Amino acid sequence: MSYYSGYSGGLGYGYGSSFGGPGCGCNSIRRLGCGSGYGGFGYGSGYGGYGYGSDYGGYGYGSSYGGYGCGCRRPSCCGRYGFSNFY
């Protein structure tokens, strides 16, 4: 499953990471899980984005702060699900 879009600091989209990391939508390099990092869209966008699992102020499945499910950044909400661990 090659769910990633290799953009370095750009806009990740679909199943894809913003920072060109592997897996289904990384937040930054080597971060796996669903939900791209910054300004992405589709499955897991980053800052103020939309879709599954946005990071900051987004909506959908699992935002970073107080979010849940797929596409969190912080291990407090991500580690338990095994999605998109920040560390």
Curated annotation (Swiss-Prot):
InterPro entries cross-referenced by the UniProt entry: KRTAP_type8/19/20/21/22 (IPR021743), KRTAP_type_19 (IPR051528)
Stored Pfam families: KRTAP (PF11759)
Spans through the membrane: none
Tissue: Strong expression in narrowly defined pattern restricted to the lower and middle cortical regions of the hair shaft in both developing and cycling hair. During hair follicle regression (catagen), expression levels decrease until expression is no longer detectable in follicles at resting stage (telogen).
GO cellular component: cytosol; intermediate filament
Induction remarks: Expression in skin and hair follicle is regulated by HOXC13 and by GATA3.
Region: 21 X 2 AA repeats of G-[YCGS], residue numbers: 6-72
Similarity comment: Belongs to the KRTAP type 19 family.
Role of this protein: In the hair cortex, hair keratin intermediate filaments are embedded in an interfilamentous matrix, consisting of hair keratin-associated proteins (KRTAP), which are essential for the formation of a rigid and resistant hair shaft through their extensive disulfide bond cross-linking with abundant cysteine residues of hair keratins. The matrix proteins include the high-sulfur and high-glycine-tyrosine keratins.
Complexes and interactors: Interacts with hair keratins.
Name this polypeptide is given: Keratin-associated protein 19-1
Classification of source organism: Eukaryota, Metazoa, Chordata, Craniata, Vertebrata
